[in-house]
Amino acid sequence: DEIALSAGGTEALYALIANYAPLRAGDAVIYADVDYDEMQFACDYLAQSRGAQLVRFDLPEPQTKANILAAYDKILRDTPRAKLLLLTHLSNRNGLVPPVKAIVAMAKARGVDVILDSAQAVGHIPFTVADTGADFIGFSLHKWLAAPLGTGGIYIARDRLKDINPWLGNRIHDADDIRARIPTGTVDFAARLTVPAAIAMQDALDLEANHRHLLRLRDYWVERVRDVPGLEIMLPDEPGSYGAVSAFRLPGMTGPDDAKKAAKLFLDKYRLLVVAKAGLASGPVLRVTPALFNSSAELDRLVAAVIAERGLFA
């Protein structure tokens, strides 16, 4: 009774953010540059529709745990009317895994609720709800858990259910039923019926072992390019602060057009999929996301391509 399935992580988080009940005029909603675009849009909508203040801040680089904690502490201290904080469990921009439990505790100590975006974390990082301390979590099931597209879910702590309003006045389910917080239209029930099998597969594979392997893949390519002159790796090698996802910036790469050009080059010339990601305060990056099936030989191709193209914008 604390979890309901949704049509994906985005729908789940829209349901939590847009229907967050305690926000009043004059309160503040906070999010950071590493947060997912659509969840930022949802916070914008929530603040505008309630007459609340919207506070966006940029996380400092290098994004060490100490720097991240200091940044969240400062923004919470500087925003005395803060009521809601959006926190991303694993950033889809650069792969940052912040110290979630510490930030949630910091926010709660100031009376600030946290909506945790775990879309990239479920099936990727081993964790439990208790590990986060969060009362509200939205997540995807098609990314790292490998369930079909159209699967995700929300978690709402039992004693906080009334703080998320039913979806557009939904009365298909009772107000004390978490399912009232999710749209009730026709869904792909076949996709949802596969979720138990996807979970069973991940359990059989051993999530802890998967995570260790993904970290090895990430470290493999990063270690081989970190000292390339002018190349920026967007996260430090601090244990617990990243997963498989990481990002880099070629020397001289500045605007979004540069990032798109580089991503196209890597795909067309080297058959390597890197993703141009904008949104970070420091500028666009190229995201690399190895999966369990990737080999060291494939990562060697990535390393060679990065070294060969280091002068693309220099």
Where are these regions (language model features)?
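Conserved PLP-anchoring active-site segment centered on the Schiff-base-forming lysine
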Residues: 2, 6-7, 20-40, 53, ...
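Active-site phosphate-binding strand-loop segment of PLP-dependent enzymes
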Residues: 53-55, 64-119, 123
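Active-site PLP attachment segment
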Residues: 132-172
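A short glycine-threonine-serine/GTX helix/turn-capping micro-motif
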Residues: 176-189
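Conserved PLP-dependent catalytic core of the aminotransferase class-I/II
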Residues: 190, 195-236
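Conserved PLP-binding catalytic core of the aspartate aminotransferase-like
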Residues: 215-219, 225-269
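PLP-dependent enzyme catalytic core of the Aspartate aminotransferase-like
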Residues: 255-258, 264-274, 278-314
